[in-house]
Amino acid sequence: MTSTYTSNTSIQQDNKIATLINVFTVEPKNQQHLVDLLIEATEKVMSQQEGFISANIHKSLDGTRVVNYAQWKSGEDFEKMLKNPRAIIHMNAALSIAKADGSLYKVVFVDNLAK
């Protein structure tokens, strides 16, 4: 499964959004399957939830990690999604093949060439 989208992700310091950074540890043989599960969850469930802004899935070159960098309008919107039965099904599928370490973050510094 490969999807190509233009991202709505904008990283700005001191904005009011909630940023989820979720690092999954996975066996290399399961890395692409996990990526596919996360993309499917995003397309079918997460993107339909109130407050969802964007999700960006990254996979490590050594095959042992997958990172989901997602943005939500608020922490409350993110917490509400966690209680959605459809979201729980997708999260459990991912957790059946990987260990997750996720937290919500606030951007405090950004530096780029386009100043």
Whereabouts are the PLM-identified features?
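Short, surface-exposed ligand-recognition loops at beta-strand->loop->(often short) alpha-helix junctions
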Residues: 25-38
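Residue-identity detector for glutamine
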Residues: 12-13, 31-32, 48-49, 71
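An amphipathic, aromatic/His-enriched active-site/gating alpha helix that lines ligand/cofactor pockets
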Residues: 2, 41-53, 71-106
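Non-catalytic surface loops within mature trypsin-like serine protease
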Residues: 26-28, 74, 109-111
